[in-house]
Amino acid sequence: MEPILAPNPNRFVIFPIQYHDIWNMYKKAEASFWTVEEVDISKDINDWNKVTPDEKYFIKHVLAFFAASDGIVNENLAERFCTEVQITEARCFYGFRMAIENIHSEMYSLLIDTYVKDSNEKNYLFNAIETMPCVKKKADWAQKWIHDSAGYGERLIAFAAVEGIFFSGSFASIFWLKKRGLMPGLTFSNELISRDEGLHCDFACLMFKHLLHPPSEETVRSIITDAVSIEQEFLTAALPVKLIGMNCEMMKTYIEFVADRLISELGFKKIYNVTNPFDFMENISLEGKTNFFEKRVGEYQKMGVMSQKDNHFSLDVDF
């Protein structure tokens, strides 16, 4: 059995830290905590009223996918990963991550609620897993892995693909809107969320490196290429990015580029060997190690959480 999955009677107590790399990842997540109340979406309505019907259609469908997908990720964490993984440091990360995914889902739901006034259309978007075939296909793929009998390692890769590949093209499309100066609330929340998901992806890669018996390269490549083809179809056929003025072929290449970064992080050879076609995505977390935590998106990071100084309590201060 994998050491990180072996029964651990000490799992209820955090100290002493055994896995410092995993603990540091948890502290990074903690330092980047945010809430929806801190995102100003009041100025988005003016832009929303100006964008074309095609752009509205695209944004609504992307938000509908995102609103549902975070719930699927959380179900996997609650039903599988949180019960399987026995090391405290990883359980801390997964527990915190569930709260973050709830915030993401609330943010997307709030954006839909703000932009869309018709109650029937709102319900249609909030129930995208049942109402939209293009969203259902991605949701079904993710949900299949929650209940799969495959080992933890394979499912770890599948959910890294969900957050690293299924989200990547949609993140890029919203950053494209930012490049055009549109929807500041949507685009700022997208920065925060893409940073979070970049960290979640990095965490999956870190957990993969702690496996003594990881899935084979062939298995990993199969899962990743499957996710790539579904995401490419989603953004070039089902919900083509040309609706917002992006190039579909470049989007296909970008998704392959992101997949290569993921498989490289896992320690395997690249599959597609392509370059990033989107210059505006050069510094985005899902692409790799530009480290949003040092850059601090929107100057947003909890004060002192990542401080390296010893946390000693002292009574020798002069009053």
Swiss-Prot record:
Fe cation 2 binds at E101, E163, E197, H200. PANTHER family: RIBONUCLEOSIDE-DIPHOSPHATE REDUCTASE SMALL CHAIN, RIBONUCLEOSIDE-DIPHOSPHATE REDUCTASE SUBUNIT M2. It comes from Vaccinia virus (strain L-IVP) (VACV). Transmembrane segments: none annotated. Interacts with RNR1/OPG080 subunit. Can interact with host RNR1 supunit. Fe cation 1 binds at D70, E101, H104. This is Ribonucleoside-diphosphate reductase small chain. InterPro entries: Ferritin-like_SF, RNR-like, RNR_small, RNR_small_AS, RNR_small_fam.
